[in-house]
């Protein structure tokens, strides 16, 4: 189940998709403005965040599953089409939702993360190559149970790894 906070409007639907580690609340300042401009606004908690379901299996967080969640929100709200806006991790989710469901999406906006077309290798394999020997949160989450155990033991360590793990040159902070 995907948690959504909806503000009724009289116009087209805009689905707002947050980044990592955030929730729908990241959009709290944009929601009233977009609603006042005549849009119906749905800011969601992405699967695994906030009020949405949190499946244990890593495969439940595939891009296909995440894009299906966005389409599910559009359907649940009774709209045929929607405008999508995503920031950070929400960017790839909205870009891929649009690419896989072009007849359902009237516009897409990605903030802070550009569109990356599918390459010859998976995104995870690309990250493994780029971040060899360095911490990168998306790779960290691929190790089943490891992140969860470390969060419970020491949330501060997780936050330091996530926010202060590498500098602009890819060097690990100490």
Roles of regions detected by a PLM:
Residues 1-3:
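Short, small-residue-biased leader/transition segments that mark boundaries at the very start
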Residues 6, 13, 49-85, 89-174:
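Flexible "cap/lid" subdomain of the alpha/beta-hydrolase fold that forms the substrate-access gate
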Residues 7-53, 87:
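Conserved HGGG/HGGXW glycine-rich cap/lid loop of the alpha/beta-hydrolase fold
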